[in-house]
């Protein structure tokens, strides 16, 4: 045992003295700090701008759009005038032209209001929809009689009355917005609540979901504005609850399977916890964009890349380089058996990989604290059986690093197996790095999900690596809560992937042992 431990320490010494080790670990640390600084600069620039108002460039763009619409409007009016003067009696064309006229006049009124009140229409302001509804309703009322000449008088008057009532409500909200933005948002939500309650075509359960959604918006009304992320989250929560109520997939209108229902229940629990716990509403700036989860994900991706490359190079040369230099013979003639020599090399590489991951974790935490301490550190929120739970930010980050270590270990063992079988450093390192980059490309592009629907995809190694999203399916506050993240690329379950990786590692380790023990070393 003492001799084995001595061999293990000797292997550790060899690894630590390699110049590539120092270089790649240094590059990893520098890259994390550099990426952090760039992200910090971008955030500071973002926070220095008021995206609810327009700058001079935006204003000029809107004015140019308005002029273009006015020119188009004049052309349409000329065509309508020609039809009404008897130059063209095509009533179908006249009907289409009046509808175009409504749309263009509505757009001009909409742009006028935005320019007059300096509102940025390119942001997701709730007031934007009110502005647009009012503008188009005003144009519709103006030309309603021309477009709907075939209507019965009572039906016509009822429709006009309904449109005017809606337009008057929108106008009240717009006028209130100039005086008190928070009060305007509450008034807007009150009108929506009244419409929901008076709608006899929806069920009581559906109405409750919609009313609850409005109540959340009212609760998180910050001076008349709701953050984009929060608003999207509330809308996504409402959409998921409606899907669950109707037992229907939101994507393709098919009935939900049992597993999909369970997943949807957990998603709803996570979304409600994020919103109702106030994760979006703290005193830290820009906290609603999930800065902590975004930057940690970026840090782990970049640093994990360098750790993987480092371990591939070290493992890919651990046997082949010693065979080529002849230094392996001094180990072979020692009293230790070959399987113990190979085991010592695996343990030394594994220890060094863990050491690199610890450096990676420390670097990430220190950089995050140094550059982003003013931003909210949100815990990971998960759910089991419809009940949400929290996981400490630092523990969650540590677990993410360890999960990244699974990928590192798989590629490390692959490189070591090739080094043992081929006894060629260039081949083992080159093939392993090519496989590593191929896996990154395939996983990031979700290629396996889209190229085929066959079961064979489950048995491709790349479909079972990169397990962060399988261990923590709600790891990104921004993406999950905004509805942009939907686990699209997951074609295997966590349990299947873990079993697959275990079998794969056993095969690679066995192949390496067999090759090292039974082949002659010249």
Q: Where do the language-model regions lie?
A:
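Hydrophobic/aromatic residues in alpha-helical transmembrane segments
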Residues: 311-315, 328, 363, 414, ...
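Secretory targeting signals
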Residues: 30-93, 100, 104-107, 111, ...
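Aromatic- and glycine-rich beta-strand/loop motifs that create alpha-glucan
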Residues: 1-28, 343
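Junction motif at the cytosolic side of a transmembrane helix
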Residues: 18, 421, 499-522
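Transmembrane helix boundary and interhelical loop/hinge segments in multi-pass membrane proteins
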Residues: 315-332
